[in-house]
Design a protein with these regions (language model features):
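N-terminal beta-strand motif that seeds the catalytic metal site of vicinal oxygen chelate
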Residues: 1-23, 72-74, 125-126
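A generic structural signal for short beta-strands and their flanking turns/coil linkers
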Residues: 8-10, 28-30, 44, 53, ...
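Conserved catalytic-core motifs of GNAT/GCN5-like acyltransferases
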Residues: 13, 33-39, 99
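Vicinal oxygen chelate
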Residues: 17-20, 74-119
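Amphipathic alpha-helical segments
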Residues: 20-33
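Conserved short beta-strand elements that form part of the metal-binding/catalytic scaffold
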Residues: 34-69, 119-124
């Protein structure tokens, strides 16, 4: 019998205008740490880490931002949703409509956008 492949992790890649600005947001506002960067002064590709989460940030040319494209939406599972909501609310990352809410599909969650319009939803099963 052939050995079956095993999926271990997923590392989503988010498009950003400036990787250095994205690193600043994810590190200083959301509490991630820099995992790697392809260049220390003008990175075009980098990864940030927090707990068991790894997100990659990739520079995209300014012309690409002129197109009306949907940006990615990540759903990140957490256990203590209330504490995370409080942590982020103190960092001024929420938009006017960010609320901690219970959903009809059985989660408690909140969502907001990073400075590059990538959506971030943090949730736990209710």
């Amino acid at each position: 019998m052939e050995t079956k492949g095993y999926l271990h992790q997923i590392h989503p890649v988010l498009p950003v205008k400036q990787v250095i600005d994205a690193l600043d947001f994810y590190v200083n506002r959301l509490g991630f740490k820099i995992g790697f960067a392809d260049d220390s002064k003008k990175p075009r590709y980098a990864g940030v880490l927090r707990d068991g989460i790894e997100i990659h940030l990739q520079w995209h040319d300014a012309k690409e931002w002129e197109l009306a494209l949907d940006r990615p939406m990540l759903r990140i599972v957490t256990q203590n949703i209330e504490a995370l909501y409080e942590e982020f609310s103190e960092k001024d990352v929420f938009h006017n409509h960010t609320l901690l809410r219970e959903t009809a599909w059985g989660t408690k969650e909140f969502a907001f956008f990073d400075p590059f319009k990538n959506g971030l939803t943090f949730y736990r099963n209710a």
